[in-house]
């Protein structure tokens, strides 16, 4: 990752663009960086814009308003990547947009932002604006409607400050974004200290764009990131979570982790992960190095993970630093149990949903579950296979092995057992149901559920054969006497 920080490099291809350099896609070679006060227009064939965005653009232009394709969509189109969203910037204030398009929601009218619904597709329309004073490191206290040039120079990075004029079929550049896109550089617009002071989330966005595009961060921008890194802790948990998700589900997730650490952004956000640095592991099991390097490698071996799976991989060894000890060798006793509790705290801090949190905690808690997979009682294996997130656990175990010693025999054996379990067909009907036990005197409640689960475990383990009810009832009577159930001679 050394070439991704602090200096430029020869233009190169981007993920998804094949071997063509960016300069080729832009139709020209690099020129000098354009100052903020200059306007540069470069002819470019019209992009394949969504029908909804084109309809809104036409409506604005026909009403006498200026309308330009803006931001990330322009960047991606020039890189040869299909944008996921098409945003427009316009001279029309939000109220005017609402007049022109009845199905408009003013989601951020105080900041000049509206969403127009066209055939069930949303198009974001933002009024050209200049941001006034920032006080909270997130948003301006007020905005002033203005022109395209001032709108461009208040944005975060030069490659995101480009417009496309659909009428004149030209890229409009006020900030030198074309040159930085051709060179492959992440550069803050204007004064980087000011940009990061305005919105501290930009610190994380710089990292994400750098690793996802494969662009180095320009030197002055990088130095400003280091100066402002501690302030990232003031970004709201929800915004941090969203940026982490974008980084962790991207193929460059391991590079993102390493660069977050080098940028001094990891410790303010995830000190538990930062603590993995320098924590040695037994070399016979972990020839790759310390816990941090292992974690980065595990992330790199995931294949198109969901966010909970990727976060579970990031946190799976979070319990190792506090449990480190040297006995006969380096050991991390019960790091899975402690790690699960720590992971739950991280998930709560990041405001994850309960479903996401449950999956992450399950993955951390059970990431060693396959160590004795062949020796497990069939009932225990079945309970593991029936877990909602078992397949995520299997994917994590494969990545865990590939990110250390490379021996994947454990997850392979687990997968064999799992496939055999699936091939056996639908689950068998229970031998007993609660009503059958209640008829002979057992009481409803948690203990009844425990008894029924024990019956099914006994059948899986071969203690009960067949599907007959009477032998199962006798098995229950022998192990869960009714005297205990009624409190006669047992605990009240």
Regions found by a protein language model. Name each.
Residues 1-492:
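Catalytic cores of the polymerase beta-like nucleotidyltransferase superfamily
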């Amino acid at each position: 990752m050394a070439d991704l920080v602090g200096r430029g490099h020869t233009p190169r291809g981007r993920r998804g663009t094949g071997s063509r350099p960016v300069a080729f896609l832009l139709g020209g070679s690099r020129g000098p960086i354009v100052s903020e006060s200059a306007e540069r227009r470069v002819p470019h064939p019209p992009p394949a814009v969504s029908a909804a965005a084109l309809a809104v653009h036409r409506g604005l232009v026909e009403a006498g308003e200026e309308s330009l394709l803006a931001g990330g969509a322009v960047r991606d189109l020039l890189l040869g990547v299909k944008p996921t969203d098409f945003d427009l910037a316009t001279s029309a204030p939000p109220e005017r947009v609402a007049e022109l398009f009845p199905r408009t929601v003013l989601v951020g009218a105080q900041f000049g932002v509206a969403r127009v619904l066209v055939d069930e597709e949303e198009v974001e329309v933002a009024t050209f604006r200049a941001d006034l004073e920032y006080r909270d490191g997130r948003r301006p206290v007020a905005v002033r409607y203005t022109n395209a040039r001032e709108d461009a120079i208040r944005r975060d990075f030069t490659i995101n400050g480009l417009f496309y004029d659909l009428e004149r079929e030209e890229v409009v550049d006020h900030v030198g974004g074309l040159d930085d896109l051709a060179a492959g550089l992440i550069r803050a617009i204007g004064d980087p200290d000011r940009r990061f002071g305005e919105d501290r989330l930009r610190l994380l966005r710089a990292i994400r764009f750098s690793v996802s595009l494969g662009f180095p961060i320009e030197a002055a921008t990088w130095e400003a990131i280091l100066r402002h890194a501690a302030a990232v802790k003031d970004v709201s948990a929800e915004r941090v979570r969203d940026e982490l998700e974008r980084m962790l589900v991207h193929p460059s997730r391991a590079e993102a982790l390493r660069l977050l650490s080098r940028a001094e952004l990891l410790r303010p956000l995830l000190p538990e992960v930062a603590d993995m640095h320098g924590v040695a592991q037994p070399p016979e099991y972990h020839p790759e190095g310390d816990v941090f390097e292992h974690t980065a490698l595990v992330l790199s071996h995931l294949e198109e993970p969901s966010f909970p799976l990727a976060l579970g991989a990031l946190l799976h060894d979070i319990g190792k630093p506090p449990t480190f000890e040297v006995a006969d060798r380096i050991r991390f006793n019960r790091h899975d149990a402690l790690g699960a509790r720590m992971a739950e705290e991280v998930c709560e801090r990041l405001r994850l949903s309960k479903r996401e949190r449950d999956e992450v905690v399950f993955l951390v808690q059970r990431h060693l579950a396959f160590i004795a997979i062949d020796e497990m009682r069939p009932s225990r294996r079945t309970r593991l296979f029936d877990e909602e997130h078992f397949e995520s656990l299997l994917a994590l175990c494969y990545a865990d092995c590939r990110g250390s010693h490379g021996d994947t025999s454990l997850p392979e054996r687990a997968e064999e057992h799992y496939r055999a379990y699936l091939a056996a067909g639908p689950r068998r009907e229970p031998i007993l149901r609660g009503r059958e036990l209640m008829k002979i005197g057992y009481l409803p409640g948690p203990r009844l559920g425990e008894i029924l689960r024990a019956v099914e475990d006994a059948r899986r383990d071969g203690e009960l054969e067949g599907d007959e009810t009477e032998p199962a009832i006798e098995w229950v009577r022998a192990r869960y006497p009714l005297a205990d159930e009624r409190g006669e001679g047992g605990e009240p």
